[in-house]
Amino acid sequence: MSKTRVYQIAEELNISNEELINKLAELDINVTDKDSVLEGEELELALEMLGEDLSQENGNVIEIDGKLTVQVLATKLDKSPSEIIMKLMKMGTMATINQEISFEIAALAAKDYGFELTVAESDDTEALEIEALMEIEEDKEEDLKPRPPVVTVMGHVDHGKTSLLDAIRKTDVISGEAGGITQHIGASEVKINGHKIVFLDTPGHEAFTSMRARGAQVTDIAILVVAADDGIMPQTVEAINHAKAAGVPLIVAINKIDKPGANPDKVKQELADQGLLVEDWGGEVIAVPVSAKKKEGIDTLLEMVLLVAEMEELRANPNKRAVGTVIEAELDKGRGPVATVLVQGGTLTVGDPIVAGVACGKVRAMINAKGKRVKTAGPSTAVEILGLSEVPQGGDQFVEVPTDKIARSVAARRQQIVRDEMLKSTQRLSLDALFSQMSEGSIKDLNIVIKADVQGSVQAVKQSLEKLSNEEVQVKVIHGGVGAVTESDILLAAASNAIIIGFNVRPVPGAESLGEKENVDIRTYTIIYKAIEDIQAAMTGMLDPEYVDEETGKAEIREIYKISGVGTVAGCYVTNGKIFRNCKVRLVRDSIIIHEGELAALKRFKDDVKEVNSGYECGMSFVNYNDIKEGDIVEAYITKEVERKL
């Protein structure tokens, strides 16, 4: 309806004329009586705002609690499911009776029936209490006690990681290896000078990437194993970058010093090239020459671990509810779900109810690093636990809770959240997504992993990209290497919220699917400048745009008219350029700007016009401004957004 009288609107909304007039006044729409006419924007505003207000006042508000399916919506609206399905089809959404639909779509459908959908607020006191229990307690200074360091050994294949761990444990596990890959994942404990050190046997990158991707930090110190006769290799560089990204202290073990071709100084030079300057070269990185085969330098290495641990002041409170991280977990045919956990605070005891991710249960048994059953495990202790309801994920936090019931409630709640998340479409971590997040200010750095066929390309691109950095946007190449894009690259990128750029290389089998699973964008190029252009485009989009005012025309006010019901109208003569109906205006009097605003109307004679050219007369009125005088100058302008360049 283009024009509608007040009494007609009152009938439509089922309220009295007087009540409608009062409500219109609240919306700054002034009408005199029931025969007053509303049209255009005023009419639309009145119907929209009053419709919403009245729906709430009349109780037409539906609360949605939990899963929202077509069946649930039909029941809430007191309509048949088939009618709701047809309604959704008209809206462009295909859904079956038991299919879950988005709240936004359901709200639009409900609005057509005169109802408003809202999400029910939970007043579940028990749920709030459970959440409070899950909060990690703040430790008091007097409760903190020194704890053993947790160490991960990293390095290139065949540089002697397992041999070094074997030498440290003084037990032979290499005979149980297959294809040079560590088969069992767990932990080892050694004592030196009365102090305990915990070694995680998990593959080095796992301790940093998958854990960090879930917000867990389990490693205190990383030992980087480099063969004295081989030097820095691609996986060594990966290990260095993983440790740097995690912010973990690094100790270098220069292994195989007993071999004829050993050259520790060459290794130190290559370390310096990677930004790791060793102590005897004036740096801060500890480097220890060792021979895992002859068990030389092992004690010195362990003493250095204790020294770094002392400098790090590693402490924890053993007298509170146990909390820690799941290192890895599996489903054992005979024992059910089995998880290796690292206790990081408190003391875990057999019989304690715990929650680990979406799993829960009472600890039925605990096995320590030596394969013996234990009843308690304090801070920096890794144990295998039995009794969980299902297999948790590596990197999940576990927390001890007061009762079994609370454990089940928390796990059930988390499972529901996981199900809800799975229903949402997962957005890939692409340049476009990064650009969007950056524009919102949620990302300050653009992290990149570079892989190429030759080292020269890696260095060239790294330097080119880092030159794009400015005070608003920082490009960080967190890893660059030669060779195909590997699963390790994907894990590093996922943990660091990075994208992967490849030059003349492709992902190895399995890496692409892992990239999709971890929502990592892998971009491959054959021309370097194209990659630089893409990154530059993403960064340029991050910069806040600049706005400039572009003057379109000027007019002089020559006459003033007072028109009843309209207000003050300026009779103008356009002296320069054009005056547009949708432009902004400045009123200038004696070279001083007295008002900035918008045009309420632009007319030629009695007709509304979109523009008036120079040399023509016109009538203007201004939004919420009437204090104009003859001789005032009207400057018309438009505001343009100017894209900034790097």
UniProtKB/Swiss-Prot annotation:
Amino-acid positions noted as binding GTP in the UniProt annotation, renumbered to this chain: 155-162, 201-205, 255-258
Signal sequence bounds: none
Record's subcellular location: Cytoplasm
GO cellular component terms attached to this protein's record: cytosol
Keyword Protein biosynthesis tagged: yes
Region feature G5, mapped onto this chain: 291-293
Source taxon at top rank: Bacteria
InterPro entries: EF-G-like_DII, IF2_II, IF2_N, P-loop_NTPase, Small_GTP-bd, T_Tr_GTP-bd_dom, TF_IF2_bacterial-like, TIF_IF2
Xref: CDD domains: IF2_eIF5B, IF2_mtIF2_II, mtIF2_IVc
Residue intervals of the tr-type G domain: 146-315
Keywords: Cytoplasm, GTP-binding, Initiation factor, Nucleotide-binding, Protein biosynthesis
One family name in Pfam for this protein: IF-2
G1: annotated segments: 155-162
Disulfide bond annotation, renumbered to this chain: none
Residue ranges, annotated region (G4): 255-258
NCBIfam families for this protein: IF-2, small_GTP
Protein family: Belongs to the TRAFAC class translation factor GTPase superfamily. Classic translation factor GTPase family. IF-2 subfamily.
Record's function text: One of the essential components for the initiation of protein synthesis. Protects formylmethionyl-tRNA from spontaneous hydrolysis and promotes its binding to the 30S ribosomal subunits. Also involved in the hydrolysis of GTP during the formation of the 70S ribosomal complex.
Protein name as annotated: Translation initiation factor IF-2
Organism of provenance: Clostridioides difficile (strain 630)
